[in-house]
């Protein structure tokens, strides 16, 4: 799923991504905390003007990003 300004989030896809994150994790609590922490960072980045204007809520964006990182680790720098 590509994240863009005018993107509509498919709720079924978002639910599947969230379930996949939880299912593949060894600790549900830590995964939930990761999602919340990432969402909080995105929210503050939005306030600081570091991110483009977006209609996607920070929690939705963090689930999508973490799911992409989990499914495609070769895209990460390092």
Curated annotation (Swiss-Prot):
Biological-process GO terms, alphabetical: DNA-templated transcription
EC assignment: 2.7.7.6
Origin: domain of life: Bacteria
Catalytic activity: RNA(n) + a ribonucleoside 5'-triphosphate = RNA(n+1) + diphosphate
Keywords: DNA-directed RNA polymerase, Nucleotidyltransferase, Transcription, Transferase
Pfam families: RNA_pol_Rpb6
GO cellular component, one term: DNA-directed RNA polymerase complex
Enzyme class: transferase
An example molecular function term from Gene Ontology annotations: DNA binding
Family the entry assigns: Belongs to the RNA polymerase subunit omega family.
Oligomer status and interactors: In cyanobacteria the RNAP catalytic core is composed of 2 alpha, 1 beta, 1 beta', 1 gamma and 1 omega subunit. When a sigma factor is associated with the core the holoenzyme is formed, which can initiate transcription.
Function: Promotes RNA polymerase assembly. Latches the N- and C-terminal regions of the beta' subunit thereby facilitating its interaction with the beta and alpha subunits.
UniProt-recorded name of the protein: DNA-directed RNA polymerase subunit omega
Species for this entry: Prochlorococcus marinus (strain AS9601)
């Amino acid at each position: 799923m590509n994240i863009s300004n005018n993107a509509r989030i498919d709720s079924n896809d978002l639910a599947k991504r969230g379930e996949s994150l939880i299912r593949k994790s060894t600790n549900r609590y830590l995964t939930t905390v990761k999602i919340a922490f990432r969402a909080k960072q995105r929210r503050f980045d939005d306030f600081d003007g570091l991110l483009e204007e977006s209609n996607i809520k920070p929690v939705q964006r963090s689930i999508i990003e973490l799911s992409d990182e989990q499914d495609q680790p070769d895209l990460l720098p390092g």
